[in-house]
């Protein structure tokens, strides 16, 4: 009987967890740009990890043209380099790199985190704006 109640409670908690994520996604995700969206400027983002992708997505949604530079051959930053059994040590509601990210568990593993990075990347059209295997050694401002 108690085991059954815990199972029901667990289901309710997971449902609420997914509802909260959906709420965050719908109300806080910036809209992806349209093809006709005016561009205000061009910004270089260094690194295609969680912070770089999140920053680039927000910049794109606010009208900036973006180029992402990363010295690695793929996105993911630290999460790409850790082993596949690594997972979050905190609840994923507190580890939201972008409102669009949607996790199926409280403590997602590396592959789910990388999948969410790819989702943000493609949703905002950033997959066409990345220069992989490119090390940034100098920065100059262009007018």
Descriptions of predicted regions:
Residues 41-69:
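N-terminal Rossmann-like FAD-binding beta1-loop-alpha1 element of flavoenzymes
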Residues 51, 56-60, 98, 118, ...:
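Amphipathic alpha-helical interaction motifs in eukaryotic regulatory proteins
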Residues 1-42:
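Extreme N-terminal leader/targeting segments of oxidoreductases
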Residues 25-28, 58, 115, 130-132:
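Eukaryotic beta-rich interaction modules
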Residues 71-119:
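Glycine-rich active-site loop/strand segments that organize a redox cofactor
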